[in-house]
Amino acid sequence: METWSKLLDGTTPSRRWRKLVLLLPPLLLFLLQTEALQGLESDDRFRTRENECHFYAGGQVYPGEVSRVSVADHSLHLSKAKISKPAPYWEGTAVINGEFKELKLTDYRGKYLVFFFYPLDFTFVCPTEIIAFGDRIEEFKSINTEVVACSVDSQFTHLAWINTPRRQGGLGPIRIPLLSDLNHQISKDYGVYLEDSGHTLRGLFIIDDKGVLRQITLNDLPVGRSVDETLRLVQAFQYTDKHGEVCPAGWKPGSETIIPDPAGKLKYFDKLN
């Protein structure tokens, strides 16, 4: 303020206005430069945090030589997959029992379907998930549920991975279909495709026997999913479908459920105290 007073002191009002007009451009330029620098610092912080999503335990989760593209971007497509709405339709070529077959969502009408995406064949966490679900497929079938895994790899890459022994990072004989999404359309419809990375996040979708989407789980790259939790969720949704009651936190088959009305809920909460 003192500087401004010295500059304007001893001048007539008209001269003061002329001096102000001359001083405004450099002042505005200074303010714009300051704001731009703050914006760059903010972008740098964002990029640093974004890159951290791809680094784990001292190394890249999916190195550049594997994904072939920069791992700095997490851009996702707007998902068509919405809870309580019909699941986005899909069809494509899958590897089933070592053979190429055409597969589509409507093949599973009348059954529950666990439909999950994994990033890439011949990677690290992915085979552990597929093997875990495949080894326990009979538990899913016993509750009228099927499991399908999907990635952006071709059916030929799927087959090569299946033909690779497990001790070498392969799948070996696998009991669930591996669906190919080579044009990325299915991944985009389900909102799991990372545009600049060229592969998907770990998305899992539970679709009921009427084709309605009931549950979505979406993991970042470093962490695999739980077969036990997926089974529990399917069983919980099937129970509510059949009985009309609702399942509290951590519910398992045989546990108490809640009647969803003001009087009915008291039967459940009275037993807790």
Curated annotation (Swiss-Prot):
Free-text description of this protein's post-translational modifications in UniProt: The enzyme can be inactivated by further oxidation of the cysteine sulfenic acid (C(P)-SOH) to sulphinic acid (C(P)-SO2H) and sulphonic acid (C(P)-SO3H) instead of its condensation to a disulfide bond.
Primary location recorded for the protein, binned into one broad class: cytoplasm
Transmembrane regions listed in the UniProt entry: none
Single GO MF descriptor: thioredoxin peroxidase activity
Extent of the signal sequence: 1-40
CDD domains reported in the protein's UniProt record: PRX_Typ2cys (cd03015)
Reactions catalysed according to its record: a hydroperoxide + [thioredoxin]-dithiol = an alcohol + [thioredoxin]-disulfide + H2O
GO cellular component terms attached to this protein's record: cytoplasm; cytosol; endoplasmic reticulum; extracellular space; smooth endoplasmic reticulum
Cell compartment(s), UniProt: Cytoplasm; Endoplasmic reticulum; Secreted
Active site location: C126 (cysteine sulfenic acid (-soh) intermediate)
Gene Ontology BP term (one): response to oxidative stress
Keywords: Antioxidant, Cytoplasm, Disulfide bond, Endoplasmic reticulum, Oxidoreductase, Peroxidase, Redox-active center, Secreted, Signal
InterPro entries: AhpC/TSA, Peroxiredoxin, Peroxiredoxin_C, Thioredoxin-like_sf, Thioredoxin_domain
Source superkingdom: Eukaryota
Enzyme Commission code(s) on record: 1.11.1.24
Assembly and binders: Homodimer; disulfide-linked, upon oxidation. 5 homodimers assemble to form a ring-like decamer.
Note: The active site is a conserved redox-active cysteine residue, the peroxidatic cysteine (C(P)), which makes the nucleophilic attack on the peroxide substrate. The peroxide oxidizes the C(P)-SH to cysteine sulfenic acid (C(P)-SOH), which then reacts with another cysteine residue, the resolving cysteine (C(R)), to form a disulfide bridge. The disulfide is subsequently reduced by an appropriate electron donor to complete the catalytic cycle. In this typical 2-Cys peroxiredoxin, C(R) is provided by the other dimeric subunit to form an intersubunit disulfide.
Function of the protein: Thiol-specific peroxidase that catalyzes the reduction of hydrogen peroxide and organic hydroperoxides to water and alcohols, respectively. Plays a role in cell protection against oxidative stress by detoxifying peroxides and as sensor of hydrogen peroxide-mediated signaling events. Regulates the activation of NF-kappa-B in the cytosol by a modulation of I-kappa-B-alpha phosphorylation.
Name under which the protein is recorded: Peroxiredoxin-4
Organism listed in the record: Rattus norvegicus (Rat)
Gene from which this protein is expressed: Prdx4
